[in-house]
Amino acid sequence: MPSLDHFGIIAPYYDRTIPLKAPQHLIELIGLPIEGAILDAGGGTGRVAQAFEHLATRVVVVDLSIGMLRQARQKGGLWPVCSETESLPFPDASFERIVMVDALHHVLSQKRTVNELWRVLKSGGRIVIEEPDVRKLSVKFVALFEKIALMRSHFIAPPEIIAMFAHLNAMTQIKLDGFNAWVIVDKN
């Protein structure tokens, strides 16, 4: 039975109802500006990626929702690509930076996604994953709502995200700020 395309339904309203907060903080965590390409994995409408448009040579937005990517295309300056994050259509070492904001809990296989992000990251590159910190009570309510709404979400704590990178010999760190956590992964 096909699942409901929640994101396709909300795509035209997404940017207005969920605006990007504090892009400067994310820009600093990612380490911008750079010469090279940035991948916004699970980037939907490109609301995050548009903050990087003039800070890199190319900004690619990957998402599975055609409705969300239509919104990204309207922004201009972004390269929207329809794909699962578990099987990215890019050669190895394609990106200097990768960001995944509020999306890891929506993918079917977090482990495969992590491995794919690592595969397409260049040596010397950085991945920043921003996720709601499921250890917080308010996030537990969000997780419950998404489960009731049949949104295939699977929230995991920041240390569990870090553990998925352990076999890759990645340099990792966690930054916390209330509702969100940022997992920062560097590839030597």
Question: What are the residue ranges of the model-derived segments?
Answer:
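C-terminal alpha-helical "lid/dimerization" subdomain adjacent to the S-adenosyl-L-methionine
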Residues: 17-18, 48, 128-183
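Conserved class I S-adenosyl-L-methionine
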Residues: 1-33, 47, 68-71, 142-145
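A conserved beta-strand element that flanks and buttresses the S-adenosyl-L-methionine
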Residues: 99
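Short glycine-centered segments of the SAM/dcSAM-binding site in methyltransferase folds
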Residues: 37, 124-126
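Short catalytic micro-motifs in class I SAM-dependent methyltransferases
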Residues: 102-103
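A short glycine-rich, Lys/Arg-flanked "PGG" loop and its adjoining helix->strand segment in the class I
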Residues: 111-123
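C-terminal lobe and adjacent flexible extensions of AdoMet/dcAdoMet transferase-like proteins
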Residues: 184-188
